[in-house]
Amino acid sequence: MSEHGSPESQWRAETIAVHGGYRPDPTTRAVAVPIYQTVAYAFDDTQHGADLFDLKVPGNIYTRITNPTTDVLEQRIAALEGGIGALALASGQAAITYAIQTIAEAGDNIVSASALYGGTYNLFAHTLPQFGIETRFADYRDPQAFGALIDERTKAVFVESIGNPRGNITDIEAVAKIAHAHGVPLIVDNTVATPYLQRSFDFGADIVVHSLTKYLGGHGNSLGGAIVDSGRFPWAEHKQRFRRLNEPDVSYHGVVYTDALGPAAYIGRARVVPLRNTGAAISPFNSFLILQGIETLALRLDRINANTLAVAKHLQGHPKVAWVNYAALPDHPEHALVQKYLRGHGSGVLTFGLPGGRAAGARFLDALQLFTRLVNLGDAKSLATHPASTTHRQLDAAELEKAGVSEDTVRLSVGIEHIDDLLADLEQALAKA
């Protein structure tokens, strides 16, 4: 993040998205961020190499850990979210995994909202338990439910700012107060909202994770993920709960992260332990492409928000549509939260159902000509999927209900095309459903 009081620290999101973390290269004067497609970096001398490995001086060792292109991406994302630092990774799933593994180990638990992206639910419900980390699921609509599940081995509370695919809006401020009352950080997946619509740290979140593959990259061409650290959670005040940050790390010559890195202890350990040791490093080329996408984030989101609201209103009045779920609609039960957290916008994901259930949904999807049938979201192109058959296919009926995914749910990720063309495609597909 930029120094407090510097011009960059006063920039709005639109400006940060274009300029954050980079000035023209001092050697070549290149205005575009260079792609440093290298594996390793030369040391000045033996002592310089030793100091780098001891974390005594900043610098690059190996692209698995740091890379100059990726460093610009990390600075830009941290500035957009208002954090102290960021760690870019190979995917959003890697970001979520490392966000937990940085502070949790066998015998620990996390408390998570049950309304989650299907991949995250599977990670929490089935994979983390294989490493001895339990996930306790709470109803996102009841902040007190999170507190009831926290104990002395709880390492984090996890929610999505806007749920995928449900489009539900989390009352982050209320959940943060519950988490902090128990001495536990709040991790928010801000993928669907993006920092353009919501800076989760402003409402009490401590850690933010992103799938950069989605709206920040914005063009469906690069996998990436990120963890952003607010630098505000008092890890050193909770030494017993967060021992890995407050006790010597034998794998790094006994460094104590809270002593060596202060408020950046968490993001520092995320880089030099889970990333260094398990290696989900982002490609410098992907970092470059995602940086290109971020430059147009505000323009794309403005168009996407307008298009999605128009689509939601059109579907809401359609005789072949049973229900529409989009929180930016005035009659949505979470509309007040959209006003509080998202400046009145609902982002680009909406869900709706057809009276004919799964079969009608399949006919609708198969009839689409402009919307692309796939499971990504956040693209400049409009996308459609049937979650129960794809992203949430591994969930049983009870798990689908907890996640808020019904058999008839169709998810749209609306893009930047002309609204009349989008509505025409939906209309002809509905006629065949």
Language model regions located:
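Short, acidic Gly/Pro/Ser/Thr-rich loop/turn segments
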Residues: 42-46, 234-235, 297, 331, ...
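Conserved PLP-enzyme active-site core in the AAT-like
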Residues: 2-8, 17-26, 85-317
